[in-house]
Amino acid sequence: MTDPCVYILGTAAVTPLAATVRENCNALLEGRTCFARPRHFDSRGRLLGVDHGLDGTGCSRMERLLRKLADSLDFAVPAGTRLFAATTVGAIDLLEQGNEADTVQEFLHMAERIFDIPDGILVSAACASGQTAAALVMRELRHGRCRHALVIGADITSEFVTAGFGALGALSHTVARPYDQDRDGLTLGEGAAALLLSCDGPGCGRLTAAAENCDAAHITSPDLSGGQLAAVCREVLGGTHPGAVIGHGTGTVYNDQAEIAALQTVFPDGMPPLFSLKGNLGHTLGATGLLQLALGLEFARRRLLPPQAGLVSPMPGANVSNTPRSLETGRLLSLNVGFGGLNSAVALEAS
């Protein structure tokens, strides 16, 4: 028996570049980036994908980001819609201000209040949180546990997270250069995205499959063979060939090495065009997966893939380009990975 279709009824994306999906895609196709020094903490000279419009006092930076996302919705949310909220660290700025609250639970409470949907479901699965939430929603819809679901993902830039990735030696000395031979680390960013999903169509697109696993190779490093990431890719593709891959592409040495190894395993006769948002936006943590799906759907609709920002010398085997490329189909594969060995793949298709 074929699983019911999961239709995408609406999308939203808020980044430092723009506050709509359309405007973000235009900016990405132009190769624009948003890297700057933050004003809300001392980054010790490091650049971040920072939204200065979120600066201020009186409430959490996360609350301002969620309100900006809610204000950007250009679709109606049906009565009875369930809320699924994804984040890596939540309202981490509350902790930095001396508040001992549970930062991810506070994030959920903010989301419930701002979107006016009670009894939300929190998903926090490191940097795979966004797509993990989307996969959970797909299962809930297909089992008839809800009719409509609003899945959101958001994370902010913070001193806490910057210091943590710095301690791991994972931050770039300049800016992230995904899939480049001379990449030297990631750049952190902030943003939010939302998808309204339902088994009731039609919509502007659909999520056709999702799969997740854990390779348990290391707490913070991926399995360099890419074997388990390749496994989830094969599971969601089911023999089909996507027009492009929206990769996790952090710009760290190990992540990109493992990802290219996985894609070469899955596509031995030629890798589809590959692109990572992180060269433009930085690593937005729990928002990353949903930004990839929301913006990826628009790429698929336009049949255009943006140029890879930061690219100078492509890694061997990586099908990346510093110019926009046309897509042969409106089918895309989106990848997320997270600390602890998490691997996630989602396939989507434009209507």
Give the residues covered by each predicted segment.
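Conserved catalytic cysteine-centered active-site region
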Residues: 1-2, 35-64, 90-140, 145, ...
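Extreme N-terminal starter segment of soluble prokaryotic enzymes
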Residues: 2-9, 330-331, 343, 350-351
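Condensing-enzyme catalytic core mediating Claisen C-C bond formation in acyl metabolism
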Residues: 3-15, 19-48, 175-244
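Cysteine-centered functional microenvironments
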Residues: 5, 12, 118-135, 177-189, ...
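Conserved active-site "lid/cap" helical segment
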Residues: 17-92, 231-241, 266, 270
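Short glycine/serine- and small hydrophobic-enriched flexible loop segments
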Residues: 71, 138-139, 198, 291-301
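Glycine-/small-residue-rich "gating" segment that lines the acyl/pantetheine channel
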Residues: 135, 157-203, 319-327, 348-349
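Acyl-CoA/ACP chain-elongation machinery
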Residues: 147-167, 172, 183, 210-224, ...
